[in-house]
């Protein structure tokens, strides 16, 4: 079976999910959106749940590659943090919080994929970043990196909780940015603050 066609179905499903949430989108909707028969759709995915799991896995693999690229190309831990912020802006600005809610409530297997990724990749990567920052003198040495790494990842989930931050009142990206900036400045030493300000000012002047 064609990998290109499978990827096209995943991309088409993601497009509709981001617009309307997962629960309200049917396999009929996806087939119609892609201009293909539902029979063709079911050649690749037995049901919507399987499609959602495939979509989550694809995006998590992409996120892991981006994280590794940022680590490899950044000169120090503060530059990593700034580049992570820019990467996060791209991701969070297109995420519909309803999608997060639907995955948690209706697709537990897909949500488990994310939880495993968080435990195996994200928390470990953040712990290593914090340790490296302490060695470089930019992150406060009094921090417990395990606690801070877990706290940060749960902050992200909280930011997408629509019962706390209703989408009618809050921009998901602005919420995530505020939480991330609060975290970054909270963990930095004075020299870390200075470098963080330098990078932020440079990014702001480029964007203007």
Where are the predicted features?
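Basic, helix-initiating cap at the start of DNA-binding domains
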Residues: 1-20, 24-36, 50-53
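Short hydrophobic/aromatic patch on the recognition helix
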Residues: 35-45
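Hydrophobic alpha-helical connector segments
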Residues: 54, 58, 65-98, 149-152, ...
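Hydrophobic/aromatic residues within well-ordered alpha-helical segments
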Residues: 48, 59, 63, 84, ...
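All-alpha amphipathic helical-bundle segments outside canonical DNA-binding/catalytic cores
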Residues: 79, 117, 135-151, 169-178
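Short secondary-structure transition hinges
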Residues: 93-127, 134-138, 146-147
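C-terminal peripheral helix-coil segments that are non-catalytic and often amphipathic
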Residues: 128-132, 136, 169-208
């Amino acid at each position: 079976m064609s990998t290109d066609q499978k990827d096209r179905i995943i991309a088409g499903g993601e497009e509709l999910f981001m617009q309307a949430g997962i629960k309200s989108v049917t396999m009929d909707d996806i087939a119609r959106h892609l201009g293909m028969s539902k029979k063709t759709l079911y050649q690749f995915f037995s049901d919507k749940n399987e499609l959602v799991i495939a979509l989550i896995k694809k995006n998590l693999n992409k996120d892991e590659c981006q994280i590794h690229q940022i680590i490899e190309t950044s000169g120090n831990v503060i530059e990593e943090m700034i580049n992570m912020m820019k990467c996060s802006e791209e991701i969070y600005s297109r995420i519909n919080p309803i999608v997060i809610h639907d995955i948690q409530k209706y697709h537990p297997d897909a949500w488990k994929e994310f939880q495993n990724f968080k435990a195996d990749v994200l928390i470990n990567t953040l712990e290593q970043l914090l340790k490296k920052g302490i060695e470089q003198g930019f992150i406060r040495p009094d921090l417990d990196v395990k606690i801070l790494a877990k706290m940060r990842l749960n902050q992200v989930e909280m930011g997408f909780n629509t019962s706390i931050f209703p989408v009618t009142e809050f921009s998901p990206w602005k919420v995530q940015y505020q939480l991330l900036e609060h975290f970054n400045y909270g963990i930095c030493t004075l020299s870390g603050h200075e470098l963080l300000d330098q990078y932020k000012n440079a990014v702001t002047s480029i964007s203007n």
